[in-house]
């Protein structure tokens, strides 16, 4: 599990013995962070496990595969007991609601399609938890994310995971340089999830065969609309489904049930050609549908840019890079034109469908897998 290793440095990149290196491990109770904690403890590091209690939404606590639910806290504690290191649970429910859940609900109300996992990493795990790690006199904080931290000529760099199928770089683009300096990602170099499970089995951890977490952690059974309705009464008020000319085709059961590019579940039949959601208008509660070709675009406005390059983002008129506009899509060629230090117009070389406000646009080097940051797609 070597990171930044060279002569005189331990596997976490420090010039001292593992026993003299304190590392806080962010433990979700899943197999990934558990394997990280176990291996580091086995290597002799001064490991401190920390689990965040993020929510208590009734059914969410019992949701199989949820992150940091009641059973997951128990699993993390068992791993710590097995490997002989201290483990703490911190109540971050109010922080999580203010920083992540409220924005998630409001984004859907505004017609966007948010990615709460990015905000959680940005505003909770890599902010408050990282500061807690420093308060515990840790030298670094390790997580179970599948991404690589590599040392460049001048500073630590963020790189895609060796296992492309597990790569989580899309969800970590907003990591700041000062955070990256303190973070470690011991699983990023592994070729497959099977290697992680083998590590957990090697140490006799009960989570070795635990299923991966699925969907959004605080949304029971994937029913995000029910969560939004609970948080924002009236969010599911009905409205009209109209075509691009404003003709009413059907009624819908709330804008929050729809996303850009959606085809299924529109309740529109008897048409010669399929229709897709091409726009959401929350002010009029209208869902606008049109032909598939209307989903294609080459221009993507991006703001709140976090830049991890070696020179200032706005020091050039344009950057030739690859970008990823959804977590499930591969990076594609683009020209990024800075408007300011935190805003840009991204021109896709080949048009893509379903570019949605609220999603992230992540910047990658054309070769080598380095992540240069990214920003949030918004309405132009």
UniProtKB/Swiss-Prot annotation:
GO molecular function: ATP binding; tRNA binding; tRNA-uridine 2-sulfurtransferase activity
Record has Transmembrane helix as a keyword: no
Residues covered by region (Interaction with tRNA): 166-168
Keyword annotations of the record: ATP-binding, Cytoplasm, Disulfide bond, Nucleotide-binding, RNA-binding, Transferase, tRNA processing, tRNA-binding
Protein family: Belongs to the MnmA/TRMU family.
UniProt EC number: 2.8.1.13
Residues engaged in binding ATP: 26-33, 52, 144
Name of the featured protein: tRNA-specific 2-thiouridylase MnmA
The protein's role, per its UniProt record: Catalyzes the 2-thiolation of uridine at the wobble position (U34) of tRNA, leading to the formation of s(2)U34.
PANTHER family membership: MITOCHONDRIAL TRNA-SPECIFIC 2-THIOURIDYLASE 1 (PTHR11933:SF5), TRNA 5-METHYLAMINOMETHYL-2-THIOURIDYLATE -METHYLTRANSFERASE (PTHR11933)
Reaction(s) catalysed (UniProt annotation): S-sulfanyl-L-cysteinyl-[protein] + uridine(34) in tRNA + AH2 + ATP = 2-thiouridine(34) in tRNA + L-cysteinyl-[protein] + A + AMP + diphosphate + H(+)
Species the sequence originates in: Jannaschia sp. (strain CCS1)
GO biological process terms on file: tRNA wobble position uridine thiolation
InterPro entries to which the protein is assigned, alphabetical: MnmA-like, MnmA-like_C, MnmA-like_central, MnmA-like_central_sf, Rossmann-like_a/b/a_fold
GO CC, alphabetical: cytoplasm
Cystine residue pairs: 120-217
Compartments reported by the entry: Cytoplasm
Catalytic residue positions: 120 (nucleophile), 217 (cysteine persulfide intermediate)
Enzyme class: transferase
Positions marked as site (Interaction with tRNA): 145, 359
Major subcellular location class: cytoplasm
């Amino acid at each position: 599990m070597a990171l930044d290793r060279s002569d005189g440095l331990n596997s976490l990149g420090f010039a001292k013995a593992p026993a003299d290196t304190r590392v806080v491990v962010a433990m979700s109770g899943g197999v990934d962070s558990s394997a990280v904690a176990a291996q580091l403890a086995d290597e002799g590091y001064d490991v401190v496990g920390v689990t965040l209690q993020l929510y208590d939404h009734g059914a969410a606590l019992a949701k199989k595969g949820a992150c940091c639910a009641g059973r997951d806290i128990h699993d993390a504690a068992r791993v710590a007991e097995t490997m002989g290191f201290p483990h703490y649970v911190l109540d971050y429910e109010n922080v999580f609601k203010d920083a992540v859940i409220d924005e998630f609900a409001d984004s859907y109300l505004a017609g966007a399609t948010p990615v709460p996992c990015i905000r959680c990493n940005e505003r909770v795990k890599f902010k408050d938890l990282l500061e807690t790690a420093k308060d515990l006199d840790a030298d670094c904080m390790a997580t179970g994310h599948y991404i690589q931290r590599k040392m460049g000529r001048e500073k630590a760099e963020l790189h895609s995971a060796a296992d492309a199928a597990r790569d989580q770089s899309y969800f970590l683009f907003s990591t700041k340089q000062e955070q990256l300096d303190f973070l470690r990602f011991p699983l990023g170099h592994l070729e497959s999830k099977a290697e992680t499970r083998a590590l957990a089995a090697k140490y006799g951890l009960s989570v070795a065969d635990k299923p991966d977490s699925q969907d959004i952690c605080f949304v029971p059974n994937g029913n995000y609309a029910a969560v939004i309705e609970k948080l924002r009464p009236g969010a599911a008020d009905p409205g009209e489904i109209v075509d691009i000319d404003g003709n009413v085709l059907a009624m819908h059961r709330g804008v929050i049930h729809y996303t850009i590019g959606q085809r299924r579940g529109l309740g529109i039949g008897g048409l010669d050609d399929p229709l897709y959601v091409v726009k959401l208008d929350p002010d009029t509660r209208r869902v606008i549908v049109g032909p598939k070709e209307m989903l294609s675009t080459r221009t993507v406005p991006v703001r709140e840019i976090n830049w991890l390059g070696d020179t200032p983002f706005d020091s050039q008129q344009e950057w030739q890079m690859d970008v990823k506009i959804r977590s499930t899509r591969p990076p594609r060629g683009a020209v990024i034109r800075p408007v300011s230090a935190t805003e840009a117009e991204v021109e896709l070389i080949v048009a893509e469908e379903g570019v949605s406000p609220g999603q992230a646009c992540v910047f990658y080097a054309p070769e080598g897998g380095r992540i240069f940051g990214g920003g949030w797609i918004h309405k132009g």
